Each structure stands twice: as C-alpha cells, then as structure tokens.
Amino acid sequence: MSANPLRVLAIANQKGGVGKTTTAINLGTALAACGERVLLIDADPQGNCSTGLGIGRTQRRTTLYDVLMGEAPVVDAAVKTELPGLDVIPADADLSGVEIELGQTARRSYRLRDALEAIRANGPYTYVLIDCPPSLNVLTVNAMTAADAVFVPLQCEFFALEGLTQLMRTIERVRGSLNPRLEIQGVVLTMYDRRNSLSEQVAKDVRAHFGDKVYDAVIPRNVRVSEAPSFGKPVLLYDLKCAGSQAYLKLAREVISRERDRQAKAA
C-alpha cells in the first residue's frame, strides 16, 4: 500500500558530512524498493545526489535550475533512474546562480512549492525527497517552504547536537514566515559504530532530546555504503545484502509505517 497523498520531505542538516546526500539517495531507493513512487530532488549545486544515482552530466539537460526559473515543469525535469519507481531532478553548477538570478523576485522562496503543486493532487509520486545544501540559502529556504516536514540525518559524532541548534532556528524562521505547517518528520542516526562508546552516548543523548522522533533504524558505518557512489549506484543496487542496505530498508519501512499512522490520525 502506497502513501497517499504526496509527502514532501526536505532532507536537511546545516552541518556538513552527516550523511545527508547518502541518506537521500538510499532512503529514496529503499522507499522505491518497498513499492513507493519516489522523486528525489537534488537541490545542491555540487550535484552529488545526481552523480550517486548514475545520472551523468549529459543526462542533465533539464535540471532543478530550470524548474526554479519557471522554464520547465517538474514532470519534464524528472529523469528515470536504474530502479523503477525512482526518478530524480538533477542539479549542476548552474544552480549556484539561482540566488542572484531570482534577486528580489516575487515569491522567490515559493518557487519550488509552486512547481510541486502540479503533482500534489494527481501526480505520479507518493514521496518527494529534497536533498538540501548544507548552507542556509535560497535553495534551502525553497526546500523547506515546499516541504511538509524536515527529515534530519544526524552523524554519531561529538558535535552532532551542536549542528542541530542552527537547523532548529532555521526551521522556526521558515515556519514563522513562509510555511506554518513545517514539522520535524524524524531524526535518523548515521555513521553509527557500535564499537565506539561515543556513538552510543550520542544516540542516547539524541533519543533523550527528540524522543520518539528518532527512528529505531540506525545507519551503521559501512564500507559498501561509502563505495557505492563512486559506481553511480545506491547501496541497495551495489550490495543488497550488506548491513548498510538492510539498515536503509528498515528505515524505509519505518518511514512508511509512521506515515500510515500519521494519515490515520489525520483522517
């Protein structure tokens, strides 16, 4: 059973190196493997999400830049990936010019939200995942303004919670002025090393702070997860049996289950 209506999630953390793009790629893949119809939006000018899904530069004729500039609808910008049910709107370096080009344009913060309206009611997708850049700029603001909720990957490292403070302030600002419905979807612990007592302590602190917003599924440090992007593949298509793949499948099932519960309560 697929989630319906569409759920738009901004995958964000304003601290770099937390596994944000890795989570976007592999959660999107795992959701599609579970039967969902997923659109990944690469909102980072570096284009790592696109590269990690095997979308070469020649396949990026239409990108998120074109969508935000009003030159292409979402459905025309979406590129099919190797996995049925998973499409991506790619990014390239042009995206870094959006902030200047939009300038003081009316509704500059609503560009992505307006573009997604066309697929909210009867589009082909059940989930949209937006891979946000780590910096707070017009791309991050557009992602959060378009999103129903923010999905937070959190690395099991010493300064993990410190990075969250800035993200929470950003969410509050967006909620106050642009998107009052924005909420925290959940927090997923990444790069977890059970041999390291620090990982255990960070996990304990995060669960104490966020309670049931923290997913039970934990993404371990896993060499196969690290290797997969260099082959242009999500880890599930690179090595399905590895611990990283199984963790992302567990996370996807948990996301779907929680979404069904949320919809049931809202009905």
Curated annotation (Swiss-Prot):
Pfam families: AAA_31 (PF13614)
Disulfide bonds: none
Residues engaged in binding ATP: 14-21
Domain of life: Bacteria
Any GO MF annotation of the entry: ATP binding
Keywords assigned: ATP-binding, Chromosome partition, Nucleotide-binding
GO annotation, biological process: chromosome segregation
PANTHER family per record: P-LOOP CONTAINING NUCLEOSIDE TRIPHOSPHATE HYDROLASE, PARA FAMILY PROTEIN CT_582
Family named by the database record: Belongs to the ParA family.
Record's function text: Involved in chromosome partition. Localize to both poles of the predivisional cell following completion of DNA replication.
Protein name: Chromosome partitioning protein ParA
Organism of provenance: Caulobacter vibrioides (strain NA1000 / CB15N)
